[in-house]
């Protein structure tokens, strides 16, 4: 993972991010940790696919399932 991506993700720890997955699901949660494979741990997580909200609590997302990460504005 490039240092630019690491710096962006590092600045988002403890902030809410949205993640688009390969299976067309969209996940929103608070970023807790990440690694060099872009595996992410999130808490207070919600699946917001198809305008339905499902609470997931704490999850680990494998980096190879992530298509896009939407970072907060600040």
Residue ranges and their predicted role:
Residues 1-74:
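Conserved RNA-binding domains used in RNP assembly and mRNA/RNA metabolism
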């Amino acid at each position: 993972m490039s240092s630019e991506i690491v710096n962006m993700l590092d600045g988002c720890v403890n902030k809410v991010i949205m993640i688009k997955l390969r299976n067309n699901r969209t996940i929103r949660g608070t970023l807790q940790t990440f690694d060099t494979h872009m595996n992410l741990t999130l808490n207070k997580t919600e699946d917001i696919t198809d305008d339905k909200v499902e609470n997931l609590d704490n999850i680990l997302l494998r980096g190879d399932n992530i298509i896009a990460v939407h970072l907060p504005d600040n």
